């Protein structure tokens, strides 16, 4: 029972709603997409979404999800086009939640992408730490592209084959502020 419309001892009339019953086993995810992306919606195949209450990114593919419909236009009351999915909920997603949705299409060939955990942001400037040798890292500014919620496309600033820090980025960032010269952290 999601909500009760009447209390104990209340009088009711014929046709009056007494309670709202909901199920949370199969849920519907509705993404509202700006009209400026209307031409790209035909390529959408699935989605990932991030919940605000646990910060976790869920994959519809891993939850038995499927695309139900892509709107042909807005409904006249909003400037957004609906894209609707259905998925199996094991109880971890709260029905009615507002989530951040990442629409997915076919993979792009020759695209360089890194885990979101590898990217740092300082005053709107995005960077990754590139490993030069086992004890030396350099902070490199990058230009970001599309994201699927777990990885982000790198448009500029990084080349294929370079080794980056994807875990422990905060520690490397803090070490860069210490002024220690890599390889010379001992006392003289």
Q: Can you annotate each of these PLM segments?
A:
Residues 1, 11, 21-23, 29-30, ...:
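Short beta-strand-turn/beta-hairpin segments enriched in glycine/proline and small hydrophobics
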Residues 1-37, 94-100:
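Surface-exposed patches in structured soluble domains
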Residues 13, 24-28, 62, 78-82, ...:
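Extracytoplasmic
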Residues 20, 42-56, 93-109, 162-167:
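A short, hydrophobic beta-strand micro-motif
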Residues 125-188:
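Short alpha-helical boundary/capping segments at helix-coil junctions
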């Amino acid at each position: 029972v999601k909500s009760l419309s009447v209390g104990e001892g209340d009088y009711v009339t014929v046709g009056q709603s007494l309670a709202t019953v909901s199920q949370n086993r199969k849920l519907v995810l509705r993404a509202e997409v700006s009209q400026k992306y209307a031409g790209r919606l035909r390529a959408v195949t699935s989605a990932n979404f991030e919940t605000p209450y646990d910060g976790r990114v869920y994959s519809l593919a891993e939850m038995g999800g499927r695309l139900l419909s892509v709107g042909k236009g807005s409904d006249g009351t909003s400037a957004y086009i609906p894209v609707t999915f259905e998925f199996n909920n094991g109880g971890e997603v709260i029905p009615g939640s507002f989530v951040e949705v990442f629409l997915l299409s076919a993979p792009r060939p020759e695209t360089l992408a890194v885990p979101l955990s590898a990217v740092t942001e300082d005053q709107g400037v995005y960077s990754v730490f590139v490993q030069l040798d086992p004890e030396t890292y350099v902070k490199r500014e990058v230009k970001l592209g599309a994201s699927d919620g777990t990885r982000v496309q790198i448009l500029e600033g990084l080349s294929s084959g370079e080794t980056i820090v994807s875990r422990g980025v905060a520690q490397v960032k803090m070490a860069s502020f210490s002024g220690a010269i890599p390889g010379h952290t001992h006392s003289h």
